[in-house]
């Protein structure tokens, strides 16, 4: 079936345009920064020019690198394992108490998926992703007793292992968050980061200050009443964590690859409509950022955007044809304040989002929406966005194929990542399996002490490869029979392609007002 003339023109424009290098905005800043530190666009020193401005290559003909890869490939050492972890040494009394209390906890909960429990310091259950609510009181009681036994000794319990499970604990007064996971190669730090994200999800609906004030005045208050409206988002987040979604795993965003001139056109449109009360405006499609303009000194964190996208794209609360105006806390930006969010879906999967610090400017935001939506419609940009997203999602961009089955590139410079679309021909190999592999590889690379490391691991019929540097992490999956020399050649081929397409794959500048 021949494509329509409209889609043909879009396809021709998308595929045949040369890559344009966009200039740096004078007032631009990094879009996202994992450390949530306000910073200007990074400068590149002469010594760091090769690392930061281009992607280095592995040299397969250099003997020491080839030997290094060969040694790694035949290394039989066990992978990173989670072990018992307490912030300070525990006394015998605390250990004995734990042994007595462990029998009260049903660890069958975590045989297949990770279980998350949240309860107040008074022992009242707040949330869990357990289907059978009847087991919560005994579980919560045992866990609270274990945690309290360490608090009495002025020690902080962070994680411990028992039977075939790992238990991690995050204390966020007045809440305790607990994760129960099957024994896994994921580190305790990785599991704690999941609990921290769950805590941030709670704060999106009720600020830390409001929660503390409520419990100070009414110590036995049932917090479920306070965060009840957030429960559907917590459940969805638990599902995504169990599916190893890449955004929370990497603490980075995945922008939609676009020609830089097209992205600039959209950004300039948003920049023309910036009322005084506006903090930021951005367009997103299917949970991927298209473009953004923001106030000069405002820095948004990947996790804050992820939690906002979660509520917009993964639930039915906002994904409709209505306009929505709701207060949302961005916990990493400020856990004690709300930003008022205006959201409107331009079509089923494409949303326009504006944020303001003022609650009474709905009609001002509505006026901006009307102007932006009309111009996007007049230029045919919405259809072009939909086409670009569909092509990127369904068309694998893999210069290393067929040697390399799939890859993930994470840019530390931009706090963004790119991974190509993938069609799964093997029934037992799906998106969750793929993401779980990347989660394990990233977790191990993240906890390496040196800034440069190479790791190759054979797992059944797969060869798993990680290359971590100060500026990027690269993970890929190949056939276990692939030689190291062939693998290196194809890794370099992919990295050269990423270097050429960098301004298309990543948002390198963002406009400020």
From Swiss-Prot:
A Pfam family that this protein carries is: Fuz_longin_2
Compartments it resides in: Endosome, Multivesicular body membrane; Prevacuolar compartment membrane; Vacuole membrane
N-terminal signal peptide: none
Sorted UniProt keywords: Autophagy, Endosome, Membrane, Protein transport, Transport, Vacuole
Q: What is its main location?
A: membrane
How does this protein lie in the membrane?
Answer: Peripheral membrane protein
Q: Where is this region: Disordered?
A: 1-26
Cellular component annotations (GO), alphabetically ordered: cell division site; cytosol; fungal-type vacuole membrane; multivesicular body membrane; nucleus
Keyword Plastid among UniProt keywords = no
Q: Name the Gene Ontology biological process terms.
A: autophagy; protein targeting to vacuole; vesicle-mediated transport
User: Which InterPro entries did the record assign?
Assistant: FUZ/MON1/HPS1_longin_1 (IPR043972), FUZ/MON1/HPS1_longin_2 (IPR043971), FUZ/MON1/HPS1_longin_3 (IPR043970), Mon1 (IPR004353)
**Do the record's keywords include Transport?**
yes
- Describe its function: In complex with CCZ1, is required for multiple vacuole delivery pathways including the cytoplasm to vacuole transport (Cvt), autophagy, pexophagy and endocytosis. The MON1-CCZ1 complex acts at the fusion of vesicles with the vacuole, through its regulation of the SNARE complex during the coordinated priming and docking stages of fusion, and particularly at the stage of tethering/docking.
Family from the record: Belongs to the MON1/SAND family.
- What protein am I looking at? Vacuolar fusion protein mon1
The source organism is: Schizosaccharomyces pombe (strain 972 / ATCC 24843) (Fission yeast)
């Amino acid at each position: 079936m021949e494509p329509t003339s409209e889609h043909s023109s879009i396809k021709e424009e998308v595929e045949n345009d040369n890559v344009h290098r966009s200039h740096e905005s004078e007032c631009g800043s990094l879009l996202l920064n994992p450390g949530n530190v306000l910073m200007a666009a990074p400068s590149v020193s002469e010594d760091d020019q090769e690392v930061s401005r281009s992607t280095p290559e592995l040299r397969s003909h250099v003997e020491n690198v080839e030997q290094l890869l060969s040694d790694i490939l035949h290394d039989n050492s066990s992978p990173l394992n989670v072990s018992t972890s307490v912030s300070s040494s525990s006394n015998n009394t605390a250990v004995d108490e734990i042994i007595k209390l462990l029998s009260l906890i049903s660890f069958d909960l975590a045989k297949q998926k990770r279980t998350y429990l949240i309860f107040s310091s008074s022992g009242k259950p707040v949330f869990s992703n357990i289907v059978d609510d009847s087991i919560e009181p005994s579980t919560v009681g045992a866990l609270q007793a274990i945690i309290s036994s360490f608090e009495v000794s002025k020690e902080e319990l962070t994680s411990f292992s028992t039977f075939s499970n790992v238990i991690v604990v995050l204390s966020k007064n007045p809440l305790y968050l607990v994760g129960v996971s099957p024994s896994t190669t994921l580190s305790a730090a990785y599991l704690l980061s999941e609990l921290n994200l769950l805590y941030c999800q709670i704060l999106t609906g009720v600020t830390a200050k409001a929660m503390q004030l409520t419990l100070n005045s009414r110590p036995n208050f049932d917090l479920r009443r306070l965060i009840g409206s957030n429960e559907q988002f917590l459940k969805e987040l638990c599902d995504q964590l169990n599916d190893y979604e890449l955004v929370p795993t990497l603490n980075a965003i995945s922008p939609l690859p676009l020609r830089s001139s097209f992205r600039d056109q959209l950004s300039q449109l948003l920049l023309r409509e910036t009322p005084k009360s506006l903090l930021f405006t951005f367009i997103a499609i299917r949970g991927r950022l298209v473009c953004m303009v923001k106030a000069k000194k405002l820095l948004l964190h990947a996790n804050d955007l992820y939690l906002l996208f979660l509520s917009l794209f993964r639930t039915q609360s906002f994904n409709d044809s209505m306009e929505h105006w709701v207060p949302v806390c961005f916990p990493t930006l400020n856990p004690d304040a709300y930003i008022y969010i205006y959201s409107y879906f331009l079509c089923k999967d494409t949303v326009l989002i504006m944020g303001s610090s003022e609650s009474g400017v709905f009609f001002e935001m509505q006026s901006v929406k009307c102007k932006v939506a009309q111009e996007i419609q007049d230029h045919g940009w919405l259809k072009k966005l939909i086409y670009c997203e569909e092509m990127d999602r369904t068309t694998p961009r893999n210069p290393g194929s067929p040697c390399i089955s799939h890859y993930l590139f994470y840019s530390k410079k931009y706090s963004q990542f790119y991974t190509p679309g993938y069609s799964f021909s093997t029934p037992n190999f799906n998106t969750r399996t793929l993401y779980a592999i990347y989660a394990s590889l990233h977790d191990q690379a993240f906890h390496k002490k040196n800034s440069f490391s190479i790791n190759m691991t054979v797992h059944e019929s797969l060869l798993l490869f990680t290359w971590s540097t100060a500026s990027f992490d690269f993970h890929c999956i190949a056939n276990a029979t692939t030689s190291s020399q062939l693998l290196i050649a194809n890794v370099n081929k992919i990295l050269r392609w990423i270097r050429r397409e960098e301004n298309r794959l990543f948002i390198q500048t963002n406009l400020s007002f």
